[in-house]
Amino acid sequence: MVKLWAIVVMVAIALLRSTFAKQLSCTMELDRSCSLIGAKVSSDEILTTTFASSNPSTLSTVQFARSSLTGIPPAMFQTFPKLESLNATGSDIKQIQSRNFADAKTLQSLYLRGNKIHDLPDVAFFGASRLQTLDLSDNAIATIESTAFKRLRELKTLLLGSNSLTELQPGVFDDLSDLERLELQQNGLGSIDDRLFQGCHSLTALNVSHNALKTFNVAQFERRWSFDLIDASYNKLSVVRIPPNLRQLVAIGNGIRTVESTATNGSELILLKLPHNKLTSVDEVPVFDKLITLDLSFNRIREFDFRSAARFGKLVLLKLDGNQLESVSNSLTAPITHLKYVHLADNQFTHLDLNVLRTVPRILKLDLRRNQLERLAVTDLAGSFPVMVRIMLEGNRFRCPDSRPLLKELKESITAYAMTRNDCRKEENLIDGICCS
Ligand SMILES: *[C@@H]1O[C@H](CO)[C@@H](O)[C@H](O)[C@H]1NC(C)=O
Ligand SMILES: *[C@@H]1O[C@H](CO)[C@@H](O)[C@H](O)[C@H]1NC(C)=O
Ligand SMILES: *[C@@H]1O[C@H](CO)[C@@H](O)[C@H](O)[C@H]1NC(C)=O
């Protein structure tokens, strides 16, 4: 008898469950999208939850807001067979099961940023073969099975930043032949295998910053076409080897002492940003003939001659702020006209003669802030630097009597320089726009 009752109760519960299986409804807007606000799906409801909307067969976009879903109910993709974009950002999602997206045949964008996903199982996105954008940033992903991204041959953007990855399985990106942009920043990656990206024939932008990489073979991205940007900042690299097809390399805050080029016949590099590393000379950077921006600020450079800048025939912006320069020299015999912006702030100049820049006549902006300049000499500013529109002098220690000749030159030129009272230290006076004492 007791047994029978138990069975009756269980059957009743089962019936109730299916009769009252959770249904999430939304109203389709004119743009074929709908929002599900405040939806709640617990782990035992994932497989039974159903969806409803007016005209579900044409719905293209679903957006969750203020929702708490343990997982994405697969019924969504059966009810909305034309779904192209699903945004479940910040929705408390904890799990993705293998083939969760088996029916997501038209899905192109999947936004799962800011959830609580710990792992991506085998064939996690199997079925969603039209996917182009997959945002998994800011989760707690520590494990990605090697087939998790299987068959995502149209995927262009994969965002895995701010997770807990310490390693990546060989082959995990092998099917991503259309992938253009990959974000892996802010994980705990200790190494990246040289063959990890061998299947990613279209990759042109990669962010591996804020990991724990001791080595990273940038040269593996040598291809016949150009690779746009690699950001390897805030790792523990001491060497970078730059392939000829790379256009921009950013590697701030490593321990880089050596920069190499693997180019034998010209390089595509236009931007090289290496602040906060351990380089001791501009000449340690090999020649890149198309380089436009070279940022070596906050390294350990003690000497600089403008001849080093002339090695880069297209260089426009040179940043050497925050080094240990006490002076600069110039052994150039012919002028260079490409260099237009020179940053020398936060060095240790006490005296500087601007005539040292006479072979850089097209300079537009010169930054000398926060040195210890007491005197800045120049003869014929307007004539030597006819296009210099700005000189930045804040945070120095100019002597008032010594700055009169400089002021005269400045007033006769187009160069803006003026400081304000706020730029001066307490004991300083502001005289004709220059703080001095
Ligand atoms: C996804 O939703 C979040 C808020 O829930 C919003 O901030 C974000 O812009 C949306 N993303 C897209 C691509 O619509
Ligand atoms: C790479 O990611 C870091 C951290 O999120 C970010 O600050 C940086 O701007 C990104 N790099 C590029 C080139 O977008
Ligand atoms: C080097 O580059 C020039 C022009 O960019 C090209 O004509 C030449 O064939 C290249 N040589 C080699 C060995 O690739």
Predicted regions and their residues:
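LRR N-terminal entry segment and analogous cap-like coil->beta motifs
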Residues: 31-92
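Solenoidal tandem-repeat scaffolds enriched in leucines and small polar residues
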Residues: 126-128, 132-264, 268-278
